[in-house]
Amino acid sequence: MPAPEGATTGAHEAHRANEAQRAQKVGIFGGTFDPPHVGHEAAARAILSDLDLDRLLLMVANDPWQKSPTRPITPAEDRFAMTQALAESIPGASDSRLEIDRGGPTYSIETVEAVLDQASREGQPEPQVFLVVGADLVPELGTWERAADLARLVTLAVVSRPSTPRPAAPPGWDVRWVDGPQVDVSSSKIREILARGGPVDGLVPPAVMLCMARRDLYAVGR
C-alpha cells in the first residue's frame, strides 16, 4: 500500500533533523601548505576514510611559529588559495581560514577552541574533534601550548607510514593511527625543485599547479 501523501517528506525532514542534532566527527588538518602537494591530498583522503569523518578542515596556518623564524613563508592569502583549490577536489574536505583571520602565531589549542565555539554559536552539538598530526610530532606533544587542555578536547589522529615505528604519546592523549601515503614528497622539496626551474609533475595536484601559475607563485609558468 503506498505511503500517505506527505509521509515520505515527513520522514526525510525527520532524518535531516536527527542528522542536525548528531554530534559530527570533525578533523582538523593544519599545515603551512607552502605549497600543498599530493602527499597532503592522499593523507586527507585516508583520514576521511579511516576515521569516517563528517568533514575535514584543511586549516591554513597564519604564522607557523615552528617555521617562520627559519625561512620566508609564502603570504597566507596565497597559501589559502592553493589549499582552497586542493579542498575542492576532495569530497568531505573544506578549506578554513580561521587561523588567518585570527592573526598572530598559530597554536592548536586556540584553533580547537574556536571550532568548538563556532559549533556552539550555530546551535550544533559539540563535535568530536580529531586533530591531525604527523608521527614525528608525537614525542613533542607535551611541549605544546596548553597541552593538557588540548589532550582533553581532542582525539589525536596520527598519520604515519605503515612501515615506520609508532612512537608512544605522552600520558592522557587519546590516539588513533592512520596509515599515511607512501609518497616521498615535501613542500620544501617542491620549492627547491621549482627554484631550479625543474618540473614538479606528479608532486603537486593539477588544481594547485593551476592556482600557483595564476598567482605567479614559486616562478611557476615563467
Set out the residue ranges of the language-model regions.
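Nucleotidyltransferase catalytic core that binds NTPs
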Residues: 1-222
